Amino acid sequence: MKVVTVDQMVGLEQAAVRHGVSLDTLMENAGLAVAEAARNELGGAAGKRVLVLVGPGNNGADGLVAARHLSRWGANATAYLVSNRPNSDPKMEPAVDYGVTVTGVDRDPELAALDQLMGRCHLVIDAILGTGKSRPLSGPVKAVMSRLEACRHTNHHPIFMALDLPTGLNPDTGEVDPACPKMDITVALGYPKAGLLGFPGAEHAGRLEVAGIGIPSGLAEESEINLDLITPEWTREHLPVRPPNSHKGTFGHTLVVAGSRNYVGAAYLAAQASVRTGAGLTTLASPSSVYPIAAGKLTEVIHLPLPEDNEGRIHPEGSQVVRSVLDRYDVLLAGCGMGWSQGTKEFLEKLLLGEIPHELLMVIDADGLDNLSQIREWWRRLGGPVVLTPHPGEMATLTGTSTPEVQRDRINSARQWSRHWNVTVVLKGAHTLIAEPAGLVRISPFVNPGLASGGTGDVLTGIIAGLMAQGLSPGVAAGCGVYIHGQAGEAVRMRIGDTGSIASDLIERLPETIRDLKRP
């Protein structure tokens, strides 16, 4: 599903008009979609009290249409005008005809009536400002937003729903005005706006739903929009096919180079995730002191012990051992739990930056990234297609910037550096991003604090490597892997909550997550 900027959304609406869809039809469809979402949230409209905060433009007109439908379905709907509407408002009279009560700031300068309405209603729809507003909030709009946020902290907290965008949220960047309230749900119209999937915007948007408004589906696909939200349908379409006459060689061989004396678990998690994602064979190359522990836990994995230094990290001489067998593997995963030292840096430099089999794919994570960042112009020496999976701190180290700089504009940061390095970048975090060198960025729909624990990144890396071993391209494997990882995390959260879940819980859920995704 395409994710759009304001200009791109305007372009799609104009293209829809050229294809015979009127702006009025788009507006009617938008209002109906929001009304249906509100009815679903309320468990039915009849007898429910709904307050629609109406602004001066098209967003407000959509809100009036929503109020009309809710009133038609039996709700007690009130349209509260935060700003003056046009004198000849084509959406006002039909709303009144269907029983919508209309009041507003001009009759309620102290906002006392607004406070009473919010105190009695079951649901509030924010239809004040849409994609056309980027100035700081002021005047009555700011005052109303402040009252809305204050209502959240009272004993009576109605459901807060935003129509397309919460008022005060920048649709392109996700920046928010200090007066922007936090919604329970945002119904994005047509396509989700980029700012709803960035932070702090996503936190203010609440749960995100996307409603079609009648824009012909082919228009977005034919456009040059290069930002996509990963969907289950997209993931299902790209999952590896497993023919009935398959054997273990059919599904590829992953080599996991990982672990150290202090981080045995990272090696285990990455290798086991590759196995559970469906790689035909997985080999773990780890320090000799890690080998007996890992071998006891990973009975389905082939083991390749490597020489180690006095601290239990892989010795630089281990690169010769690994390089001598590289032609046996389809994917090389390197970095998880390796630790950082001059020796591990030398090991990785000799392993990754020398001549390697041309068809070998690579995934580099965690300590592999930190070691890589110490090698001058490492990206010019990498061979073969590569996926990097940094969290924001690792991304800052790789780019020579800071974590706040990376987080301030995650999409452009991932896209820019993916192009510069000519690698696929998986920038982890809430709404993980997958950026490909050609400029396409995919966004994960998942935000799960339960995944903020040690080892979950190692699992993600193993999933991506396992999918690449089965023949998926780096960008597609990263997109599918991020979605599978997120969906497995949701399954864990549903079962035990988001406190106390561990990375191993994700691995247990991988086979059934993939099974469920394959079901139409």
Task: Label each region the model flagged.
Residues 165, 189-191, 260, 366, ...:
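Residues immediately flanking
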Residues 122-123, 128-225:
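Internal gly/pro-rich beta-alpha loop/helix module
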Residues 156-158, 366-371:
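Ser/Thr/Gly-rich flexible loops in soluble cytosolic domains mediating phosphotransfer, phosphorylation
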Residues 36-130, 136-163, 354-361, 379, ...:
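Nucleotide and nucleotide-moiety/phosphate-recognizing core
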Residues 1-82, 196-363, 370-387, 392-520:
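Small-residue (G/A/S/T)-rich helix-start motifs and N-terminal tracts that mark the onset
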Residues 85, 130-135, 170, 176, ...:
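Short strand->helix junction
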Residues 93-95, 118, 176, 297-301, ...:
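Short low-complexity, flexible loop/linker segments enriched in glycine and/or proline
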Residues 84-85, 107-109, 167-169, 192-193, ...:
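Short beta->alpha connector loops
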